[in-house]
């Protein structure tokens, strides 16, 4: 029996595999509000479908929240969020964004 890792590595190496590697992912628009619930939802999805690759899919706003952007999920099933607070109001605002540390809470 081939493991997920062996299947992916064989594919990368151009070798024959027992079947093509399969990976699907989705957003979890309610569970993505906190790292723990997102991890739990992602693991449950993987345990249910047993894909060859797991992709963690946070809310699309995770990379801007530490600058003060705020958003809200309003029920869109694909996970789209509505921005409720933007930090860029004028072109010059780009010049005043602070450099974020890699350890910032949402990064």
Briefly describe each language-model feature range.
Residues 1-107:
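Catalytic cores of TIM-barrel enzymes
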């Amino acid at each position: 029996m081939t493991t997920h890792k062996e299947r992916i590595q064989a594919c990368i190496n151009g070798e024959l595999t027992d079947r093509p590697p399969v990976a699907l992912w989705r957003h979890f628009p309610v569970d993505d509000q906190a790292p723990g619930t997102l991890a739990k939802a992602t693991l449950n999805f993987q345990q249910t479908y047993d894909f060859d690759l797991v992709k963690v899919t946070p809310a699309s706003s995770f990379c801007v929240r530490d600058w003060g952007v705020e958003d809200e999920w309003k029920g869109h099933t694909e996970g789209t969020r509505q921005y409720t607070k933007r930090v860029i109001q004028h072109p010059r605002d780009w010049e005043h964004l602070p450099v974020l540390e890699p350890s910032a809470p949402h990064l």
